[in-house]
């Protein structure tokens, strides 16, 4: 019985010692992130679609901050994201690159023609935001609330049954961009 307690104490002390060493090393050798990259990354839509030419939103944010990359290459974010980045960096806004040249681009979502879907799951694997649901050899469908319209699911489909359809804004589907609404603190008087 005595040897069990010795073993438990020895392992506990080893765990405590290694934890202290790891804690010290993580603080001593910590790499500080660029705060500008962090802010740009927060503004980007995090769809990781690659339409900007980078493998995800974080590498694009690093390229904007460190390499002077154009701020107008995020198609899913559109003009709103470009304007926020230009305001953050205090640079001139630029027209949106690529196919998103319109002033107010229409929101599009992927639509699957379920009669032609063979259930291969290639679209599910390609979707960066997990907006497509279905199982192998079963019908797939797109959850339109989650779809960013990034177009990454269209090309892998072997039966070409996926298309992008514009979504009309209705009072039910339209979402406020709360970050563009100015907020003021109004003093309130309390009367007894």
UniProtKB/Swiss-Prot annotation:
One of its GO terms (biological process) is electron transport chain. Its EC number is 7.-.-.-. SUPFAM superfamilies: 4Fe-4S ferredoxins. Keywords: 4Fe-4S, Cell inner membrane, Cell membrane, Electron transport, Iron, Iron-sulfur, Membrane, Metal-binding, Repeat, Translocase, Transport. The keyword ATP-binding does not apply. One of its GO terms (cellular component) is plasma membrane. Signal peptide: none annotated. This is Ion-translocating oxidoreductase complex subunit B. The lineage of its organism: Bacteria, Pseudomonadati, Pseudomonadota, Gammaproteobacteria, Enterobacterales. The gene is rsxB.
């Amino acid at each position: 019985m005595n040897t069990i307690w010795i073993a438990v104490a020895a392992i506990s002390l080893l765990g405590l010692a290694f934890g202290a060493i790891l804690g010290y090393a993580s603080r001593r050798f910590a790499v500080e992130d660029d705060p500008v990259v962090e802010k740009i990354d927060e503004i980007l839509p995090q769809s990781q679609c690659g339409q900007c030419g980078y493998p995800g939103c974080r590498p694009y944010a690093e390229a904007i901050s460190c390499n002077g990359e154009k701020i107008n290459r995020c198609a899913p974010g559109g003009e709103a994201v470009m304007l926020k980045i230009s305001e953050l960096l205090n640079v001139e806004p630029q027209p949106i690159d690529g196919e998103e040249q319109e002033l107010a681009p229409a929101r599009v979502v992927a639509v699957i023609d379920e009669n032609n879907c063979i259930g291969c799951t290639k679209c599910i694997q390609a979707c960066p935001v997990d907006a497509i649901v279905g199982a192998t050899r079963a019908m797939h469908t797109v959850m339109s609330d989650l779809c960013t319209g990034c177009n990454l699911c269209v090309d892998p489909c072997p039966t070409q049954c996926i298309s992008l359809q514009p979504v009309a804004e209705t009072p039910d589907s339209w979402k406020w961009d709360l970050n563009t609404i100015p907020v003021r603190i109004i003093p309130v008087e309390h009367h007894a």
